Amino acid sequence: MALSWTMDKLGPIARSAEDCALVLQAIHGPDGKDASVVPATFDWAGVGDWHSLRIGYLKSEFNPLQPLKLDEPAAGETPEKKKDREKRNAEQTASHARRAYDQRYDLAALDKLRAMGVQLIPVQLPKLPYGAMTNLLTAEGAAAFDDLTLSGRDKLLTAQGPEDWPNLFRTARFYPAVEYIQANRARTLAVQQVSALFNEVDIIVTATTGMQLVATNLTGHPALIVPNGLRGAAAPSPPKIDDGENDDIGGPGTPVSLTFLAGHYQDAQLAAFGHAYQQATGFHKLHPKLD
């Protein structure tokens, strides 16, 4: 289903980068039904030796995490506001603990790449207000589901919290037009400046989480997310959710991932490098226990 017409993208999900490349080879390119599709080439077999690629890494994503700052109670906080704040703080605490644990896998990936002969080049994401641009996604999503909101059928959705889609769609109607236009102007700068990074390198290695996730959603640069191991027994347990059950995020035995980014329409280079990493690690062959 559509959520954001200028940010939605289709891509294969498969066991390996090679399988993804084979599927993308079959589905890429215009079909005459979508005027936004560019007739870019995808020559998986013609990439050549991946050793000739310049490989960068987002240095800030591999630095030690900063201490977590939780929201403090506001003056005159109501019980409902307190509940929301405590829930938000609990989610942030769980996310921070999981990220701190997972970082060992990211650092090990850099070591593995160096062992493969990769000369890693440190790069930085351009300093732009990516977080302020996320309202573009919400506004487009609200437009895509406007009939649902106006009909009142959005009340049938079970998740009705402040940050759940029904309420985000409702509040999107109050976005000032000036702020929406300014966010689009900032997005144009993001496309230009992130694209400029790929004048320096061909591939960027980064953690799967972090601001790059927001940035590449806005700029449309291709991303390949590959398995990067399984969490050990000491991994933080998933947090509880509203119904008292454990969330399905993280926990011992669950997989971690790593992200590779490339310039626009350089998906074939991306797949070739991801394939090389998987050949050297074998993480794509692991299976988490399902009992």
Regions from the PLM with identified roles:
Residues M1-Y101, Q279-D291:
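A short helix-breaking turn/cap at a secondary-structure junction
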Residues D19-V23, Y105, E179, A183, ...:
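Short amphipathic alpha-helical coupling segments at ligand-binding clamshell hinges
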Residues S52-T93, I121, N135-V191, A233-L258:
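Short helix-loop capping/hinge segments that flank enzyme active sites or metal/cofactor-binding pockets
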Residues K112, V214-N217:
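Hydrophobic/aromatic ligand-binding patch that stacks against planar heteroaromatic rings
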